[in-house]
């Protein structure tokens, strides 16, 4: 079951988070029209499934929520991602993941991060405080089999945590992205910063089971070949092509089969879901 743990965490990092970038030292361009793609009270549910030949089984669910809080006298966004395996799968391998981020109302500048991951007998806790002036992330990292470690992680202009990255991605300047452009992506997790390559593919109408057909922006993410991911293939990511920029799907090729995520339900969106061009008919 170690492979499942690595797979779900890797997909969480690469499929939902690693979309901030640096190209020639610059981050991926953000929209400048002042439109917020999310609002307090938004709730997005993702279904995560494993596919192998004719076998397709939902094994986990992720829930993303948004609100606003006060942090050290500053009003900030607070976002949370909670992921857990399905009840039937808990018998084989139980996963409970919580990721929380606090970031500035303007500019998505991170302030604080908390991670609590419980996966089988594995348990990890990350607590970050961002110090832009010092260029450091003050981190407390703890594992189930080790003492808590306090350290500083390098903090660059384009370095984010899992959930902050996800909401940064939703503020991308979609109209100015050019198909085929490759960006470097970075994300802080545990005691290090991880990188990969992100390629903007272009527009696509994507069918989501249970939801309908959605106009989307498609991205490819190059994954390092290893014990879980297959080499020479990209993970694929889709965001709705409207003012909400909702993540609607991802796919990551594995050594055996593939892991897929799809939008399951949504509520409290900041704008009309105009990207939903062909809703599923309710009988």
Regions found by a protein language model. Give the residues of each.
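Active-site/ligand-binding surface loops and adjacent short beta/alpha elements
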Residues: 132-189
């Amino acid at each position: 079951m170690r492979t499942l743990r690595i797979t779900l965490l890797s997909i969480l990092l690469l499929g939902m988070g690693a979309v901030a970038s640096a190209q020639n030292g610059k981050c991926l361009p953000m929209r400048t029209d002042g439109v917020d793609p999310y609002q307090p009270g938004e709730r997005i549910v993702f279904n995560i499934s494993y596919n192998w030949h004719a076998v397709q089984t939902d094994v986990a669910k992720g829930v993303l929520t948004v609100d606003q809080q006060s942090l050290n006298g500053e009003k900030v966004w607070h976002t949370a991602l909670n992921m857990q395996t399905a009840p039937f799968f808990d018998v084989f391998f139980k996963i409970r993941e919580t990721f929380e981020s606090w970031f500035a109302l303007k500019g998505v500048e991170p302030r604080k991060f908390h991670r609590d991951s419980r996966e089988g007998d594995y348990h990890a806790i990350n607590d970050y405080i961002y110090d832009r002036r010092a260029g450091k992330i003050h981190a407390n990292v703890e594992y189930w089999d080790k003492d808590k470690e306090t350290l500083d992680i390098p903090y660059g202009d384009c370095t984010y945590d899992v959930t902050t990255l996800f909401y940064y991605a939703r503020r991308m300047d979609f109209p100015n992205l050019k198909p085929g452009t490759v960006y470097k992506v970075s994300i802080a997790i545990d005691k290090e910063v991880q990188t990969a390559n992100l390629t903007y593919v272009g527009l696509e109408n994507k069918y989501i089971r249970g939801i309908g057909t959605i106009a989307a922006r498609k991205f490819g993410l190059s994954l390092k070949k290893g014990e879980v991911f297959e080499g020479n293939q990209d993970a694929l990511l889709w965001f709705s092509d409207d003012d909400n920029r909702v993540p609607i799907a991802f796919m990551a090729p594995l050594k055996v089969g593939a892991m897929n995520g799809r939008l399951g339900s949504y509520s409290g969106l900041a704008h009309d879901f105009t990207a939903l061009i062909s809703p599923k008919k309710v009988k």
